[in-house]
A protein has these predicted regions:
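A donor-sugar binding/catalytic signature common to diverse glycosyltransferases
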Residues: 51-92
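Hydrophobic/aromatic beta-strand patches that form the interior of the parallel beta-sheet core
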Residues: 17, 45, 60-62, 81, ...
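C-terminal amphipathic helix plus adjacent low-complexity
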Residues: 125-176
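Short, ordered loop/turn segments at secondary-structure junctions
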Residues: 22, 85-87, 110-112
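Acidic, glycine-centered active-site loop in nucleotide-sugar glycosyltransferases
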Residues: 76, 94-104
Length: 176
């Protein structure tokens, strides 16, 4: 809720997807807020199985440093602004350090920080483009066959075997 006034100030230029998880009280507060501010375009969801789709439709995600959410954001090319209201929790610190060191990801500790980040990006689109480019440099495209070969090699090492990856489905056996 603390970030909504910042977004509202830019209602003519931004929109938001708000996900509340299973927090029904927050969901009701946001429904009420949205009713009072029809000029701001926002999509509101409780718990969602569609986060992967919502990330693909987003230019940025503001989130805590949960590893799963951050990995999904990276996979779907959606830069992260880390919500550090109350600080970075110990279980979030490695994820935060990875994205801070690797992509110079932004961290916000209050609505003022968010206003500065959003204002800079809106006033200087090249700044957002650079943030996104840095973020995308953290990605790598993995060839699934490479992973399979590495797993087979690891299995061979443990089992002291010499197996090789086989095509799937296996070729039809000829007449005997």
């Amino acid at each position: 809720l603390q970030l909504l006034p910042v977004l509202l100030a830019h209602a003519d230029r931004v929109q938001a997807i708000l996900i509340c998880g299973r927090n029904r009280e927050l969901h009701h507060e946001l429904l009420h807020w949205r009713t009072e501010h029809p000029e701001f375009r926002c999509h509101l969801e409780g718990y969602s199985e569609s986060v992967h789709l919502l990330l693909q439709a987003s230019d940025v995600i503001v989130t805590r440093g949960g590893t799963t959410t951050c990995a999904k954001a990276l996979h779907f090319r959606c830069p992260i602004v880390f919500n550090a209201f109350g600080g970075i929790m110990p279980q979030e610190s490695l994820t935060w350090k990875f994205f801070r060191n690797g992509a110079a990801s932004e961290k916000i500790e209050d609505a003022g920080d968010f206003a500065r980040v959003l204002g800079r990006w809106l006033d200087e689109p090249a700044t957002y483009a650079a943030v996104r480019e840095n973020f995308l440099r953290l990605r790598y495209e993995e060839d699934p066959t490479t992973v399979i070969d590495e797993l087979v090699a690891l299995g061979n090492e443990v089992a002291r075997a010499e197996l090789r990856r086989q095509p799937f489905p296996p070729p039809e056996a000829g007449p005997a």
